Amino acid sequence: MGIFSIANQHIRFAVKLATAIVLALFVGFHFQLETPRWAVLTAAIVAAGPAFAAGGEPYSGAIRYRGFLRIIGTFIGCIAGLVIIIAMIRAPLLMILVCCIWAGFCTWISSLVRIENSYAWGLAGYTALIIVITIQPEPLLTPQFAVERCSEIVIGIVCAIMADLLFSPRSIKQEVDRELESLLVAQYQLMQLCIKHGDGEVVDKAWGDLVRRTTALQGMRSNLNMESSRWARANRRLKAINTLSLTLITQSCETYLIQNTRPELITDTFREFFDTPVETAQDVHKQLKRLRRVIAWTGERETPVTIYSWVAAATRYQLLKRGVISNTKINATEEEILQGEPEVKVESAERHHAMVNFWRTTLSCILGTLFWLWTGWTSGSGAMVMIAVVTSLAMRLPNPRMVAIDFIYGTLAALPLGLLYFLVIIPNTQQSMLLLCISLAVLGFFLGIEVQKRRLGSMGALASTINIIVLDNPMTFHFSQFLDSALGQIVGCVLAFTVILLVRDKSRDRTGRVLLNQFVSAAVSAMTTNVARRKENHLPALYQQLFLLMNKFPGDLPKFRLALTMIIAHQRLRDAPIPVNEDLSAFHRQMRRTADHVISARSDDKRRRYFGQLLEELEIYQEKLRIWQAPPQVTEPVHRLAGMLHKYQHALTDS
C-alpha cells in the first residue's frame, strides 16, 4: 500500500470523523458559543484518539468511553482550577507554580491507575493549567470561562458520540467469539508441548504468546462491556474465562517443570493420548470428552494432579465459552463457576516510574513558566499549555519520547496546513456555513485516514491545526496572532521533549526487581491455613504483573521463567493440605511480614538482610513441617520454592 493510498476499511471512520467535526462546528456557531474551536477540537480528539490507538476504526463503545473520561477529567480540572484561583488570586506566580505541581500530581496518579482510566487524570492536570493561564488578563471571569469550557467540551463529546452511532460502529463480539475458540485450541496445543517435554524455548514462546492473548482477550472484554448493557452476561462469563485461561497456562507449565525431576509421573497413557493433533475447537471438545473417560477409568489418584486440574479448568472454559457465544441466561452450573474466589488487587510496582513522571511534568511546566516570564512572549502561555498537554499525555504511555516526537511533527505539519486554512480557505468560506463545514470536513476526512494508519505526527497535526485556525465567534484574522499560536505550539512541544530527554527514567530495573519480589511475596503468602485467605484469587493479578515484566524486559527469558515458577509455586501451595495448628499459623504471619519487608526495603543492604532472613525462616518452616508430619503435597513445593529463592537471591535483591 502506497503512502498516499486510501484503503476501503479506512473510509468509514474518516467520514465519521469528518461528520463529528462538522456537527460540533455547526452546533457551536448555532448556539453562539464564544469559542466553537473547543467543541470542534474535543470532537476531533475524542473520535480520533481511539482510532490512533487501535490502528483502525475503533470498536463500538470506545469513543463513548473516551468521551466519558474526558468529561470527568474536564470537570475535575475545572474544579481544581477554580479552587487554586480562589485561594491564590493575590499571588499570580505562586498560583501558576501550584498549577504546575497539580499537573505533575495528576500525571503521577495517571501512571498508577489502569491505562484506560489514566486519560481522565492527565486531562484534569492540564485543564486546570489552561484555566489559570487563560484568565490571567481578567481573573474575575474565571467561573464564566470554566462553565463555557465545560459546555463546549460536552457539546464536542456529544457530537463525536452522535457521529459514532450514525455510522453503526462495528461490534467486537464476533472477534471475541473467534478468539475464544482459537484460544482453547492453543491451550490444548501448549499442554501437548509440555507433556512431550521438548525444546524449552518453544514452550517458552508458546506460553508467552498465550499470556499475551489472554491479556488481549481481557481488553476485548472491557470493549464489549463498554459497547452495550446487553452483553452483561457475556462480560461476567469472560471475567471467569480469564482466570480459567491463566489456570490452564499454569497447569501446563507445571506439567513441564515436574518432568524435569520426576518424568515418571506422566504415564504412557497420557503421553499417547496427547499425541493426537487438534486443529479446531470441535477437535478439542472430542478430546476432552475422551480424556474425562480416561480419568474416570484410571481414577483421580492415578492421574497427575496438574492434568486433572487442567481438564477441570478446560471443561469449565468450554461451558462458559458456549454461554458467551450464545449470550443465553446463566444456568445454575455456570452460576456456581462464576461465584468463584474474590480477585486480589496488588500494589503497583511502578511507583518510582510514576514519581519520575511527576517530576518530568512539573519541571517542564515550571520551565515553560520561566520561559514565558523571561521572554514576555505573547504566546508563551500557548507554549505552556502544549508543554502540559504533551507531558500529561505522553507520560502514561510506554514510550513518552516517541509521543513527544509525534507532537513535534504534528505541530510542524500544522503550520503550513493551518496557514492554508487561515489565509485562503476560511476567509473565502466564512460567509457560507455550508462551505465552512465542507472545508473542515475535507481536513477531517484526510487526517482521519492518516490517523488510522498511525502515521507519525497525524494525531498531533489534527489537534494542532484545529487549535490555531480561527474558529471563534466572531472570527478575527490577525496574522501575528496566528503565527504566535503556531510557533507557541512548536516551542512548547520542543521544551517538553527536552525535559523528557534530560530527566532520564532509570526505573526499569527497579520495577523489574519489585515485580519479582512481589511474585516471591505472593508465593510466601500462599502458605496459610486461613480459609478466607486461601480462597483469594491472585492469578489475574500475578499474570498482569508477568505481562508488565514481559513488556519491560522483552526477550529476558530467565526473568519470565522465574516469575512463572513463582506463580506455579503460589498455585500449588494455595491448594496444599497444610496442617492446621497455631504454631504454623504464627510462622506463616512471620514469613509474610518478612516478605513485605523485602519489597518495601529502600536499600540493597536492607533488602539482602531481609531476604536472608526469609531464606532462614523457610529452612525453619521446612523443619516444622517435618515435625508436624506434613504430606509430600506440602513439603515438596516448599522445598522447590526455597531452592528457587536460594538460586536467584542475587537477581531478587541487587539493584
UniProtKB/Swiss-Prot annotation:
GO CC annotation, single: plasma membrane
Transmembrane segments: 13-33, 38-58, 69-89, 93-113, 121-141, 152-172, 370-390, 407-427, 431-451, 459-479, 482-502
Membrane topology: Multi-pass membrane protein
GO biological process: carboxylic acid transport
Localisation: Cell inner membrane
Pfam families: FUSC
Key words, A-Z: Cell inner membrane, Cell membrane, Membrane, Transmembrane, Transmembrane helix, Transport
Signal sequence, start to end: none
Residues in the Periplasmic compartment per record: 1-12, 59-68, 114-120, 173-369, 428-430, 480-481
Protein name, entry field: p-hydroxybenzoic acid efflux pump subunit AaeB
Biological source species: Shigella flexneri
Source species taxonomy: Bacteria, Pseudomonadati, Pseudomonadota, Gammaproteobacteria, Enterobacterales
